[in-house]
Amino acid sequence: MSDIPGDLKFLKSHEWVRIEDNNRAIVGISDHAQNLLGDLVYVELPNIGDHLDAGTTAAVIESVKAASDIYSPVTGKVIEVNTTLSDKPETINEDPYGEGWIMVIEMQAPEEISDLLSPDDYTKVLESDEH
């Protein structure tokens, strides 16, 4: 298992969020998730301006193995999407915590962050899934 950056928060469904200034939340999927999915072949991104509620489907990724919904970790408005993924979905496989980010959400309820998993808690979820 790769190192999990300490500045991230997670959903049990393997999405991560990195909080920046001005209530901006960058969202992607974990290294564990991209490993499970295998080689990604398609990413359906949300539209800029879309309103997302925490826990609802925000995007869809498809691999050679399966399609998987990506859930929004926070409530807010999509203000940016990673258009690189349209042509190079494998960027998520190559750099899930960096260049493989999926979208940026302007959070409307920053307090939701406290409901998300810390890197240590997420690691425990992964370890319990393996047994």
Swiss-Prot record:
UniProtKB keywords: Lipoyl
Domain Lipoyl-binding positions: 24-106
Entries under Pfam families matching the protein: GCV_H (PF01597)
Residues that span the membrane, as ranges: none
UniProt cofactor note: Binds 1 lipoyl cofactor covalently.
Cofactors, names only: (R)-lipoate
Cellular component terms (Gene Ontology): cytosol; glycine cleavage complex
InterPro entries with a match to the protein in the record: 2-oxoA_DH_lipoyl-BS, Biotin_lipoyl, GCV_H, GCV_H/Fam206, GCV_H_sub, Single_hybrid_motif
Residues carrying N6-lipoyllysine: K65
GO biological process, one term: glycine decarboxylation via glycine cleavage system
CDD domains the record matches: GCS_H (cd06848)
Function: The glycine cleavage system catalyzes the degradation of glycine. The H protein shuttles the methylamine group of glycine from the P protein to the T protein.
Subunit comment: The glycine cleavage system is composed of four proteins: P, T, L and H.
Homology family: Belongs to the GcvH family.
Name this protein carries in UniProt: Glycine cleavage system H protein
